[in-house]
Structures are given as C-alpha cells and as structure tokens.
Amino acid sequence: MKTSAIFTACFPPALACRPDNTAFANKDTFLENSRPSTNALLFCIIGTEQGAISLKYYLAVDIGASSGRHIVGWNDGGELKTEEVYRFPNGVTELDGHLTWDIDALTGHVKTGIERAREKFGTIESLSVDTWGVDYVLLKGDEALYPCYAYRDSRTDSIIDEVHGKIAFSELHRRTGIQFQPFNTVYQLYADQKAGRLAGVTDFLMIPEYLMYRLCGAKSHEYTNATTGGLVSAATSEYDKEVIAALGLPEGLFRPLQQPGTVIGEYEGMKVVLCATHDTGSAVEGIPMEENAPYISSGTWSLLGIKTPRPITDEASELANWSNEGGVGYNRYQKNIMGMWLVNRLRSELCPDKQFGEIVAEAEASRYEETVDANANAFLAPDSMAAAFDAALSEQPGSVGDYFRCAYRSLALSYMDAVQELERNTGREYGAIYIVGGGAKNAFLNRLTEEATGKKVVALPIEATALGNLKIQMERE
C-alpha cells in the first residue's frame, strides 16, 4: 500500500492549507504542517497504486446538556462527509431535591446510537464520546455510586467559602487558571468529601470517560476535560497535588492524565479513542478559523476565547474571571457565558410549541430596550426563568417577543464585554469572531453581536464539536 493522495476537507467553501492548493509530499509532512492550525482539516486517504480507495468510517458521540447526537464521518474523494444517525434528548432529573443526570439512560442512548451507525455503515473504525465538563461519576471498584449530580445543583453553595478558607481563590486561579464557577469539580468533590460520599471510593470518571468505560471497561482520565474542574496545574498539565492536599481530598483518586488521540480499548471490534472529551475542546478543533482568532462555541453555554501557547493566570485574568482549559497542543483562554440556556428556558416556559424561527421574528419586531446581566447567578438554575428576568428588570416585558429580545441583546452585550476584556488581557485587537454551535444559526443574534462588539462575525452553522471529535480520531491514524 502506498499513499495515493492527500486531500483537503471539509467545510463549504473548502479551505486549502497551501496557497497553490498542492498536496504535501507525504503523511509526515502533512501532519507536521497541519498542527496546530485548524485553517483546514486535512486527512490522508491510503489507497493502492491503482487508486482503489477503501472508505473508513468513524463515529463521534457528542452529548450536550439538552441533547445528544451520533455522527458518522468519512473521507470520500477528498471531502469529509458526515451523517447524523441518531439523536436523543438529555436533561437534568430532580431526585430527592437535587438535580442529577440519568447516567444509565445516557449509556443506553450511547449504545443505541452505535448500533444505528453500524446498521447504516457496517464497520466502524473507532468511536469517541464528548460531553460537557466538570461533572463526574464516583466509583467503588467497578460499581458506580449514584446519584450522578448535575452541575446546576445547588449542593456546593454552602461550601464555597470553606474551600476558599483552605485555599484562597486567587491562589487557586494562579495554580489552575480556572475561572470561578460554583459548580467546578473542585467544589463538587469537596462537597462529596464533606457529605462522606468519598469513603471507599476508588476512582472518579468524568461523564464521557464513564460512558466509554461502560463500553470498553477501561478507566481513563482525559486531559482537556480534567482541566475544566479547577484541579489541574496550569504549569504541569497534571493534577495539582498541593491543591488536592490543601482540601484533604484522597490523593489516590487523581491519576495521570491522558491526551486526546489515545486508544483506551475496544467495543465490539471498534477502537475506543479519547477525543478532546470536553465538548468545547473538540469544538475548537473543528473550527476552520484564522490562527489566534476569537471563537464562540454557542450552545447551552457560550464559550468565548482564543488559543494561546500557554495558560494566562495573571491578576487581570483572575479579576475578570477568565479560564484556561486544555486544548489539543495548546491552551484555550476563554470565558463561560450563560448562552442559549436563557433562551431555551424562556421557550419552555412561555411558548414551548413555537418554533425558533417564529420566536426570533417576534424578538426582531419587539422594541423592548432593557437588558440583564446574562451571567448573573440568578439565571443559573432558577425555578422560573421568566420570573428571574422580571426580577432583574425595571420595566416588565409586555410580550413573548420582549423577553426574547431582552435575552438576545443581553447575550450580545455579554459577548461585547468579554471581547473587550480579551483585548485588554492579551494586548491585542481582533477583527473577527468565529461562531459555531446552535447559536451560529441565529442571524438576529449574530447581527446583534456584530453591532455590540464591532467585530465581523463569521457564523459557521456546523457540528464543530463532532467534526473536532472525528478529526482527532482520524489524525490518530
């Protein structure tokens, strides 16, 4: 077998890596030149001298806080093609006064989607799972300890000050580079410790690692997802033993971290591979953007940031509550913004039967001008999102369109604030913002974002997370 061609893939319009559109001489040159840039996704297709090509299929399982999807990807004549084969709903479940994830139901959906992929495409070379960050499953030996708490649960509220009494947040940020969020893994594990839940626990797996464990039996600890929780050293890219010791957490729970691209096992003949298992980590890998351009991964949360060579943990970043999360060979300097959570909750309360096209049209027609602080804690997990808006506004919205106009304008202004902070903290000006995810399909919000930030918005209505997941699997070969 010889390398017969190297092709450029995959987003319309196709982006070529070389100005003259010529292929690289060999696979090594291709790999050297294609990292860490994501100007284009490049893949090698190996064929015979006669040009016969055997298609290889890969499966990305991408699960968000409100839904999950299974997407098969393959390289067909130089074009990366994808097909969604399964989609399912997700959401928190209230159990004994706490918000939890039905992890067994998620496992069932993961397996069902895999079967759908095999029914349609036959042999699947490999699969990988990505999800949101910070949440985890505790294990006693091979048995899961339930419930699996969801990050919007309030169980950490009472222990934040206690944690910061043992290690000041300024020190925590300096060591780990992670912004303050009351649901960070560091606070959740401390709450478990206080409640006695860690007694006898032998391991904890982040949600995607647990789902892959249920497939192949291998316990893994992937780097990008681990960094979301406020426990990984920004200097060493491993768990910070001093933070762990300061909080009295069991040191044995914190294993060496594994990088994206690692094969951890097999499931019914398919390799199980670690992608960037934090969904934003995979999403950034899937964005075809200019080097060092800001991005917004717009879903339940909006993550706005840039790639940097190393973490930025200075005082300005701490005071502005910026985060440093692991990427595939780079750091993601970014900020969490409340995102489509606001819009989705308003819709579920005010107009669950309306399509988003109709909602956006009503928001555009509205003349309501007040806004809210989209990142206020009042919007994190309210009993009623509409009531939370009412309490924050001096003039009550008079229509459904008013609520949504307020929400969209508030999000755009939060993007503006974040971009201004980014430019101050990095000492650079940026001309464009690349937006992917569900929010990229909202032309009204994109226009508001352009007006608020003064930046060109490049909206890419693509499944960037799944594409990044697939890219990592394919590049492994």
Placement of each model-derived feature along the sequence:
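N-terminal glycine/serine-rich phosphate-binding loop of ATP-dependent small-molecule kinases
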Residues: 10-12, 16-17, 21-146, 269-272, ...
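Nucleotide/phosphate-binding loop and acidic/charged catalytic motifs
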Residues: 153, 221-226
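Short glycine-rich phosphate-binding loop at a beta-alpha junction
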Residues: 123-131, 428-437
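Active-site phosphate-binding/coordination module
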Residues: 118-184
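A charged, well-structured terminal subsegment
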Residues: 184-190
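A structural motif shared across PLP-dependent enzymes of the aminotransferase-like
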Residues: 152-162, 182-184, 232-240, 261-266, ...
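Active-site core segments that coordinate phosphate-bearing ligands/cofactors
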Residues: 59-60, 164-176, 190-202, 206, ...
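Extreme N-terminal basic, low-complexity initiation segments
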Residues: 1-13
